[in-house]
Structure formats: C-alpha cells, structure tokens
Amino acid sequence: MAIIGIGIDVINIFRFKKLIINYGIKIPKKILSKKELIEYSYTHKKEKFLAIRFSIKEAIAKAIGISIFKNNFLNNCEIFYNKKKKIQLTTLGYIKKIFKKSQVKKIFLSVTDSNKHTYAIAILEK
C-alpha cells in the first residue's frame, strides 16, 4: 500500500467558543453533517465538539489536497466513534467521489485534545 497524503491540524478551542457566541448555530451548520448536528445538540462541550470535528476534517482535506471550502467539504465528511471508541470517517457526496477517484483504501485518523487545543492527523493510503 502507498501513502496518498498526510494531513495535520491544530485548533484553538477558545476560537470556536467565540464563534458560537458570535454566530450561534450558523457555525455548526457549516462544519457538521446532519448526523453530527444531532449529536452536537446533545453535547455539553459544544466548542470542544466543533474544534475536534473541524481539526479532523481539516487534516483529511490536507491529506487529500483539497480546500475545506470546496463543494461543502466539511458537511460531506462525517466523523463518529465506533464501539471501540476509535474515530471513523464516512464520506458523503462530492468527497466520496474524490476519495474513489484518488483510490483511497484506508484512512488512519488520530485526535487528541487539551483544555486549549485539539490536534489531529490523517493518513490516507491506496
């Protein structure tokens, strides 16, 4: 297997707290898929939830080499945790086509956070 790309991202969580205060639900709607929005509505740490999802999606975009602003990239990546608490990705719409065209077979994702920052890495493999 060959590595297609590696993406890394670091986010300041406080930035998302300010965005939520200033723009309300507009920000989550730009970043999250429909399923993620439902999960978001139940979480207590909304800024951390958004920061984690955004940093993972940004790392994925960097790994594949496209802009997060192209064709609703952020809404077409769905991040969830499986039963073993491992991060998983579901691609939707345009992003699903890009991954197929790029022959992405495996996606390795990792994220960690502190009180101030989230850190994410994505490795895409053929």
UniProtKB/Swiss-Prot annotation:
Entry cofactors: Mg(2+)
GO MF assignments: holo-[acyl-carrier-protein] synthase activity; magnesium ion binding
EC number(s) per entry: 2.7.8.7
Binding site for Mg(2+): D9, E58
Entry annotated with the keyword Metal-binding: yes
InterPro entries recorded: 4-PPantetheinyl_Trfase_dom (IPR008278), 4-PPantetheinyl_Trfase_dom_sf (IPR037143), ACPS (IPR002582), Ppantetheine-prot_Trfase_dom (IPR004568)
Top enzyme category: transferase
Keywords linked to the UniProt accession: Cytoplasm, Fatty acid biosynthesis, Fatty acid metabolism, Lipid biosynthesis, Lipid metabolism, Magnesium, Metal-binding, Transferase
Domain of life: Bacteria
GO cellular component terms given for this protein: cytoplasm
Compartment(s) of residence: Cytoplasm
Record flagged with keyword Transferase: yes
A Pfam family it matches: ACPS
Swiss-Prot/TrEMBL GO biological process terms: fatty acid biosynthetic process
Catalytic activity: apo-[ACP] + CoA = holo-[ACP] + adenosine 3',5'-bisphosphate + H(+)
HAMAP family to which the protein is assigned, alphabetical: AcpS
Record family assignment: Belongs to the P-Pant transferase superfamily. AcpS family.
Protein role: Transfers the 4'-phosphopantetheine moiety from coenzyme A to a Ser of acyl-carrier-protein.
Protein name: Holo-[acyl-carrier-protein] synthase
Source organism of this protein record: Buchnera aphidicola subsp. Cinara cedri (strain Cc)
